[in-house]
Every structure is written in C-alpha cells, then in structure tokens.
Amino acid sequence: MAKLGVNIDHIANVRQARQTVEPDPVQFAFLAELGGADSITIHLREDRRHIQDRDIYLLKDTIKTKLNLEMAATEEMLRISKKLLPDYVTLVPEKRKEITTEGGLDVKNNEKYLKNYVNSLKSSNIEVSAFIDPANDQINSSGEIGFDFIELHTGKYAGLKGQDQYVELQKIIESSYYAVDIGLIVNAGHGLNYQNVKKIASINNMNELNIGHSIVSRALAVGLERAVREMKTLISIN
C-alpha cells in the first residue's frame, strides 16, 4: 500500500493572507499525523509566500513521522536544508509568478549542476528526490545523478478526463516500472484528490503519494484529522 505524505502549505497560505500567527501549520501537522499521515511535506519557497523559516525548524523538532522539504535547487536552500537536516528533500522547479508548481524539474538538461547539488545533500545524510514529469529521459538522468527517489508529476493526469486521462495514467505506470528497474524509489503527486487518487495508489510499485490541496479543502468541512483518514482509506482500497 502506498504511504501518504500530507502537504500543509495551504494551512500556511491562510495564515499569510493576514500576515498573522494563525492557523499554525505546526499544529495542523500534528492533526495530520493523528489522521494517519506517514510524512509531512512542506515547500519553502524563495519568496516565502506560505511556509516560513520558523515553521520548518519547529516541524523538524515536533513531528513524529518524516519531514519532506520541497525546495528549489538554490544555494540558499542548500544551506538551509543542510542546517535543518530533514528526512528527505524533494527538488522542484520554481517560478515567482506561478500559483503552484507548473511542471517537473528538467533534470536532463541540468545534470552537472544537479549532480553536485545532490552529492552535497547526500553528504549530510539527506535522501533526495526529484519532482519530474513521467518521461524516461528524465528518469534516466535522475538515476545517473544519484537521486534516491523520483516524484512523478501527476498534474496532467489530474486535469484530464476519459480516454485522455487513461493514456496519461498508462504513461505514469510505465514510468514507475522503468524507474524501479533502474533502482529508483517512486513517489507521485500534484493534483491528486478523493476522486482520482485510487488509480495512482493502485500502481504496484508506488511508494508514497504527496497530497495537499484536496485534503485541506476537505478539512474545511470535516476537520484535518478526518480528511487525512479518509484519504488513507481510499489509498488502501485497491
């Protein structure tokens, strides 16, 4: 059964909308764990639009599961992550004007830089993942660089319907098997919700799904603990 990583960025979004102290994502991480989250995911963006530096250190000290830090491959983030020492880092592309991450990291065309970057993280015993599109050339480069994991971008799958969605699902399935064959652990995320998650969760070699927006949206009606528990139930039913 795939594990569930709960992204709590949207809790911080509500707080930052008023530049105040609540809701506190650290408190909500505790509720996510009570609901069965296997890890807590946070994205420390360069512009600090939601998660703040104080959040990451408090989360590292207080959560009982694992901490997945999403970040851009910048020198600032390298320094922060080597000080924080999260359980693992997921490298993502980042654009200032985007609402959310729009696509996968271009590992293939940045191999030299990313290899040095990944080696630096791993020298601090941090496992490293690449958030990439389901494409074999990106998977190959991820393996050659030395990433421990990949996270397959499911945003396109989530935005399609019918036969088009089926075709994209097959691409994700094929990519996941290919990645496992070359020694990578496979995660997936982006756009997954209570309606579309089961087909991704049922992929045999899927390690973990990272889900945020849909869980936080559901939590407005039923509370975060229950929202996480409901998602865990869906993931476990194949």
UniProtKB/Swiss-Prot annotation:
Function noted in UniProt: Catalyzes the complicated ring closure reaction between the two acyclic compounds 1-deoxy-D-xylulose-5-phosphate (DXP) and 3-amino-2-oxopropyl phosphate (1-amino-acetone-3-phosphate or AAP) to form pyridoxine 5'-phosphate (PNP) and inorganic phosphate.
Residues forming the catalytic site: H43, E70, H190
Protein's GO biological process: pyridoxine biosynthetic process
Recorded metabolic or biological pathway in which this protein acts: Cofactor biosynthesis; pyridoxine 5'-phosphate biosynthesis; pyridoxine 5'-phosphate from D-erythrose 4-phosphate: step 5/5
Cross-referenced PANTHER family: PYRIDOXINE 5'-PHOSPHATE SYNTHASE (PTHR30456:SF0)
EC number of the protein: 2.6.99.2
Positions annotated to bind 1-deoxy-D-xylulose 5-phosphate: D9, H10, R45, H50, T100
Reactions the enzyme catalyzes: 3-amino-2-oxopropyl phosphate + 1-deoxy-D-xylulose 5-phosphate = pyridoxine 5'-phosphate + phosphate + 2 H2O + H(+)
Predominant place of localization: cytoplasm
Protein's recorded name: Pyridoxine 5'-phosphate synthase
Protein family membership: Belongs to the PNP synthase family.
CDD domains in the cross-refs: PNPsynthase
